[in-house]
A protein has these predicted regions:
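Bacterial N-terminal signal peptides that target proteins for export
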Residues: 1-7
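N-terminal small/polar-rich segments of proteins
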Residues: 19-88, 112-155
């Protein structure tokens, strides 16, 4: 009886991680209408953010339409109007953590259970836009507009 030992090699491939998915829905245009420069102007809307990570974590980054992503509204020749952006990972709030252009705010958690927010909580976060009273007082009468881009990333 002859016994031979053959080397045994096994190639074990790690299973690919499930694709990390995040989604934001429920965003609408924010219209301030005619404003009086007596106090700050604040508008909030509740949105839905979904994250499929086990802890449902995400980070949010905001970019405005001003130079370098600044949060400004433009009125063409009438100038610009600065605004602030706040975020909360809870819905129905009119204040949150201040965001800076291009800087991610991490540590956010979603309660959404469905990627399209069609079932479970339909609103999970608050977006707040604030125009400071001093900026309103210094602004010329005009129609101002701008674009805010939000990026949601898994965390």
């Amino acid at each position: 009886v002859v016994a031979r030992a053959w080397p045994l090699a096994a190639l074990l491939a790690a299973s690919p991680l499930a694709a990390q998915e995040v989604n934001i829905s429920g965003l609408t245009d924010i219209n301030f209408g005619a404003l009086r420069p007596v106090s700050e102007a604040r508008r909030a809307q509740s949105v839905c953010v979904f994250s499929n990570l086990p802890a449902r974590g995400y980070m949010v980054t905001a970019q405005g339409s001003g130079a370098g992503g600044a949060f400004v509204l433009d009125a063409g020749g009438a100038g610009e109007l600065r605004y602030g952006v706040e975020w909360s990972d809870r819905p129905d709030l009119d204040s949150g953590m201040p965001l800076q252009p291009g800087q991610a705010l991490g540590g956010q958690t979603s309660t959404a259970t469905d990627a399209t927010c069609g079932s479970g909580p339909v609103r999970t976060a608050s977006l707040v836009i604030v125009i400071p009273a001093a900026d309103l007082a210094a602004a010329r009468a005009a129609a101002f507009s701008g674009t805010l881009t939000l990026t949601i990333a898994p965390q």
